[in-house]
């Protein structure tokens, strides 16, 4: 239950009600992408993961739940972010438990449209990691607007 609640916690973020497309990088078992799709069926969701067995599992879950307008991609985040069909195509990029924040920013920010948002789900004490990521975020054209702790 905790994973579902955590997945939906981003709806409190300013501007979420304008989101029409989300990419979930390193989706794993589909968190937060699948719960977001269930609650917000109108949002286009892309689930990206490097392990094909996870993608096969997610496809089975999507079929079983009858979810529509949701895409799964087997591939590496750093490779797909260079492809024109995915680069700067999403209002929101989310990711949880994938990498440190500097690396994660390099993977995820290229997917976000100008004016969009990247929300990394992080746990524990993140102040040092946040500080270490500031340069990468700036180089990639992003800025840290808010840190929300749940």
Q: Where are these predicted regions, by residue range?
A:
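Helix-to-beta-strand junctions that scaffold the AdoMet/dcAdoMet cofactor pocket
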Residues: 40, 112-114
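Conserved beta-strand segments of alpha/beta enzyme cores
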Residues: 44, 69-71, 117, 143-146
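Conserved beta-strand signature within the Rossmann-like core of class I S-adenosyl-L-methionine
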Residues: 115-125
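Class I SAM-dependent methyltransferase Rossmann-like catalytic core
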Residues: 1-2
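Active-site capping/gating segments
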Residues: 125-150
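Conserved SAM/SAH cofactor-binding pocket of Class I
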Residues: 5-97, 105
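Short glycine-/small-residue-rich Rossmann-like dinucleotide-binding loops
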Residues: 97-98, 123
